Amino acid sequence: MIIKDIYGKDILTSDNYIALGSFDGLHLGHLSLIHKVHEEAQKNGGRSIVYTFKNHPRALLNKDDAPKLLMDNNEKAEFLEKCGVDILYFQEFNKEFMEMTPKEFIEFLINRFNIKGLIVGFNYKFGYKNMGDTELLKELQKEYNFKLFIMEPCKYDGKVIS
């Protein structure tokens, strides 16, 4: 597996399928995204990418509110490699990234990673003030011509657990 810091300037030209999320701990919901990105990449001859944060977003917004991470980035990388992920990108959550609009973020992904498929959870939020959501992604997939996969919540005993 290739591990990248997003500050690198490489642009990927192969067809890529990307799972987005904070992946602060790898629970059942995260595993469903990872399985789907791997499956779609293999089925379509592309590469699987997990795009996540180096630091938890709440650590920038309010350090006292930042959750304790269940895995550090090295453990996360080892686990994702065992899951068959081709490329892991770590994004520093900083002021510049935080102020990116939802559309700017998707344009960045399209231009940088040649995205053919985007995999997110049912409650995925992104962009400035979390203004982007799965409904916006449904609109943007038409404009930017990528497949969108929204994973359903994982339930146990009828209750959403992730």
What are these regions (language model features)?
Residues M1-S162:
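Nucleotidyltransferase catalytic core that binds NTPs
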